[in-house]
A protein has these predicted regions:
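Cleavable N-terminal export/targeting peptides
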Residues: 1-25
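Outer-membrane beta-barrel proteins
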Residues: 16-19, 56, 63-65, 105-110, ...
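Short glycine/proline- and aromatic-enriched beta-strand/turn motifs that initiate or cap beta-hairpins
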Residues: 16-69, 73-79
C-alpha cells in the first residue's frame, strides 16, 4: 500500500509539473472567430455594424529564450442591413472581412508563473462588399502591444495586453486584449480571446496545441 501511495503521489507530482512548466511560445491553434467593425451612417440611411463570423488559424514559434515570432489569419462574413427612418429596412449586402497578422515578440519571466510580453506586429485588413462593383477596401497597420501572461493554476493561463495601432485602417487606436487557456493535457488546450477598442472588436474560441 505504501508503495502504491508513493507511486500515485509521484505520478500526480509529475503531471502537475508538466502542466505548470512555464509558458509555451511555440504553438498552433484554430477555431471560430468574429470580427466586428462599427460603420458610420450616411445621410438619410442607417447601416448595421459588421459582425463577421468565421474562422481563425494562428501560431507562434520561439526563436530564442527571449524572442518569438507569431502570426494569425482571421476571416468571416456577415449580411449587413441598410435601413431608412422613413422607409424602414431597405435591404442588405454580404460583406467579407479578413485580417492577417505577422509579428515578433519579446518575453521575460517576472516570476515562475508570470511573463512580461512586448510585441510589434503588422496587420493587413480587407473588407469586401459583394456586388458593389467597387472592389475590396484594404489597408496595412502597425501595432505595438505590451502585457502579461500568468498561470492562475497549473493548467489555467490568462493574459492581458494593451495595444496601440496606427495606419490605414486604425487611426491611432488604443485597444485591450484578454485571453484564457485551459489545458486539457500538457499539449492540448482550449483557448478564448477577446479584443476591443475604438470602433473594432474581435472574439475567438478554439483549440491550441503547444509544443
Amino acid at each position: 500500500m505504501k508503495k502504491q501511495l508513493a507511486l500515485a503521489l509521484a505520478l500526480a507530482a509529475a503531471s502537475g509539473a508538466a502542466f505548470a512548466d512555464g509558458h509555451s511560445y511555440t504553438y498552433l491553434e484554430a477555431g471560430f472567430a468574429q470580427l466586428d467593425q462599427e460603420l458610420p451612417g450616411t445621410e438619410g440611411f442607417e447601416v448595421d455594424d459588421i459582425e463577421a463570423g468565421g474562422f481563425f488559424v494562428a501560431g507562434s514559434a520561439a526563436v530564442s529564450p527571449s524572442f518569438h515570432v507569431f502570426g494569425a489569419y482571421r476571416k468571416g462574413d456577415d449580411d449587413v442591413g441598410v435601413s431608412s427612418p422613413v422607409l424602414g429596412e431597405i435591404g442588405s449586402s454580404n460583406v467579407d472581412m479578413s485580417q492577417a497578422v505577422l509579428g515578433v515578440g519579446y518575453h521575460h519571466g517576472l516570476n515562475a508563473r508570470t511573463d512580461l510580453v512586448a510585441e510589434l506586429s503588422w496587420l493587413a485588413t480587407e473588407i469586401d462588399v459583394k456586388g458593389d462593383n467597387e472592389g475590396a477596401q484594404d489597408g496595412d497597420d502597425v501595432r505595438a502591444g505590451v502585457g502579461v501572461r500568468h498561470l492562475i493554476a497549473d493548467n489555467v493561463e490568462v493574459w492581458i495586453k494593451g495595444n496601440y495601432t496606427d495606419g490605414d485602417v486604425y487611426d491611432g487606436a488604443f485597444s485591450a486584449s484578454v485571453g484564457l487557456q485551459y489545458k486539457l493535457t500538457p499539449t492540448w488546450g482550449l483557448v478564448g480571446e477577446a479584443e476591443g477598442g475604438g470602433d473594432t472588436a474581435m472574439f475567438a474560441v478554439g483549440v491550441r496545441a503547444s509544443f
